[in-house]
């Protein structure tokens, strides 16, 4: 009977240890906030926008947006990056 109690206690200790180590690992990874910068251009081309964003910020994504919904074509390049 005593052996089963020790096995249960040991199993609970192992599970608790794994949980604590997992929680510490999540905290160590950290969370990077996303920022964006909008650049005015005459006519935004997706490929050029992405290249421009990567030049300004090492790891970035770029997308073309319109300054106003009624604009005929996208005229702004929005860079999204970790700040």
Swiss-Prot record:
Keywords: Antimicrobial, Disulfide bond, Fungicide, Plant defense, Secreted, Signal
KW Transit peptide (keyword) present: no
Pfam families, sorted: SLR1-BP
Disulfide feature: 35-83, 44-64, 49-77, 53-79
Cellular component terms (Gene Ontology): extracellular region
InterPro entries assigned to the protein according to its UniProt record, in alphabetical order: DEFL
GO annotation, biological process: defense response to fungus; killing of cells of another organism
Subcellular location: Secreted
Signal peptide: 1-25
PANTHER family linked to this entry: DEFENSIN-LIKE PROTEIN 153-RELATED, DEFENSIN-LIKE PROTEIN 184-RELATED
Family of the protein in this entry: Belongs to the DEFL family.
Stated name of the protein: Putative defensin-like protein 150
Annotated organism of origin: Arabidopsis thaliana (Mouse-ear cress)
Gene from which this protein is expressed: LCR32
